[in-house]
């Protein structure tokens, strides 16, 4: 290639480019035979993005070339013309993008789905710089290395308004992330309206104020789906359960600490012999399962303690029952932080293990389970990076480096 390879981010599987620059018409005609409302909205969005950098008013003097070839046609072909209501773990994002100046300047996109077509349009948008492309002959072939390309947003500790979440989703789409891990409950709050237990959010005041209505969640999921992004909810139990304290009481959720209450700070759920805690959590998670269409539900299960009546065995039983309920009663795949497998041993064979602290992905995939890598030393962007700018190399750690090829297939491809 004649110029820097960083034309598209993240860098695709294959990129070939050569030839002189190619100007792009301020009026792009994007056509497709795939009758998808989602793809139509993607075309509308990316047309607006490209127009912002193509419009003559936004170009520096001398960038336009009278009589030079102009790219004015973009043709999209979707090989599997089935419109999924929402993206899932089975969704395909592969695409091929070609740009040719001859015989007539045009871009051609072949994608496996409307999600792949949107990724190609994102790549095409990134190629347009000040009204032109860096080369007139470009071929991009791309598919994700990882099925789960996620970002976690902690709304259990801090509330983020819906418009802020939408801005985040736009940014995620720009770098081809496809999972918003919505950490919806923690010490401070349960951040989603429950119609079965309305006091969960009606009691949120002061610094703990702020929650999403169920209509907000539906709108968030729809906005994310349009950008090929799944919304995977996490309801962190039995530890990190201070946000569930409004459900405490003789007939509700029981807690390990004596005197647990709104001012206790940290709450851990007790798996009481009468099953009151489990019954309340099952009812709440069932409601949330109906609200979130994704096929994965994250149960947290991290950082529990042996405290008061809460023993390691009682914690194991509680986590195992909830993981089983997610799979059997709700028809979803359970997920938990690494403690669900390495500490409590409560992970079922189908449980996705989210490694983050003391363990690595190969320890999970060696057991035949799927792993999501979220190692705090590499990926916690709210923490200061050691060594200043030089410390960012940890962010580029290859999370699959020590995973045997035979274990990568079910876990990533």
Question: Model segments located where?
Answer:
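Active-site beta-loop-alpha junctions enriched in small/polar residues
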Residues: 156, 185-189, 236-240, 302-304, ...
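Flexible, acidic glycine-rich loops studded with aromatic residues
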Residues: 339, 346-351, 357-413
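Active-site neighborhood of glycoside hydrolase catalytic domains
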Residues: 261, 265-352, 356-368
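Short alpha-helical segments and helix-capping/turn motifs at coil-helix boundaries
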Residues: 49, 53-61, 165-168, 217-218, ...
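Feature activates predominantly on carbohydrate-active enzymes
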Residues: 88-278, 285-296
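Extracytoplasmic/secreted cell-surface and envelope-processing proteins
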Residues: 189-192, 240-243, 307-309, 344-346, ...
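Acidic, contiguous N-terminal accessory segments
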Residues: 1-149, 289, 334-343, 347-349
């Amino acid at each position: 290639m004649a110029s820097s390879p960083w034309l598209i981010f993240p860098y695709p599987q294959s990129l070939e480019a050569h030839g002189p620059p190619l100007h792009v018409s301020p009026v792009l005609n994007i056509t497709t035979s795939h009758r998808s409302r989602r793809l139509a909205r993607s075309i509308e969005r990316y047309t607006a993005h490209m127009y912002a950098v193509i419009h003559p008013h936004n170009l520096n003097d001398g960038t336009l070339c009278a009589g030079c070839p102009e790219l004015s046609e973009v043709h999209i072909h979707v090989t599997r013309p089935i419109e999924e209501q929402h993206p899932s773990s089975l969704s395909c994002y592969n695409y091929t993008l070609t740009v040719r100046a001859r015989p007539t300047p045009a871009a051609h996109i072949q994608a496996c789905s409307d999600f792949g077509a949107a990724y190609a349009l994102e790549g095409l948008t990134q190629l347009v710089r000040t009204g032109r492309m860096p080369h007139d002959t470009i071929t991009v072939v791309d598919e994700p290395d990882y099925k789960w390309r996620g970002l976690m947003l902690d709304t259990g500790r801090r509330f983020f308004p819906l418009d802020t979440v939408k801005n985040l989703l736009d940014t995620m789409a720009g770098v081809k992330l496809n999972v918003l891990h919505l950490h919806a409950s923690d010490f401070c709050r349960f951040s989603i309206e429950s119609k079965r237990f309305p006091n969960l959010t009606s009691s949120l005041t002061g610094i703990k104020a702020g929650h999403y209505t169920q209509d907000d969640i539906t709108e968030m999921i729809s906005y994310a789906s349009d950008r090929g992004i799944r919304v995977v909810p996490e309801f962190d139990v039995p530890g990190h359960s201070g946000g569930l304290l409004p459900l405490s009481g003789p007939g509700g959720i029981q807690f390990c600490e004596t005197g647990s209450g709104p001012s206790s700070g940290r709450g851990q759920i007790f798996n009481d012999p009468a099953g009151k805690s489990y019954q309340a959590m099952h009812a709440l998670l069932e409601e949330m399962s109906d609200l979130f269409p994704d096929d994965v539900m994250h149960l947290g299960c991290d950082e529990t303690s042996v405290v008061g009546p809460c023993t390691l065995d009682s914690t194991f039983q509680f986590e195992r029952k909830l993981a089983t309920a997610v799979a059997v009663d709700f028809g979803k795949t359970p997920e938990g932080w690494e403690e669900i497998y390495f500490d409590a041993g409560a992970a079922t064979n189908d449980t996705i293990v989210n490694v983050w602290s003391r363990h690595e992905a190969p320890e999970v995939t060696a057991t035949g389970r799927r792993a999501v890598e979220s190692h705090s030393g590499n990926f916690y962007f709210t923490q200061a990076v050691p060594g200043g700018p030089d410390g960012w190399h940890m962010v580029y750690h290859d999370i699959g480096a020590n995973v045997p090829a035979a274990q990568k297939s079910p876990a990533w491809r």
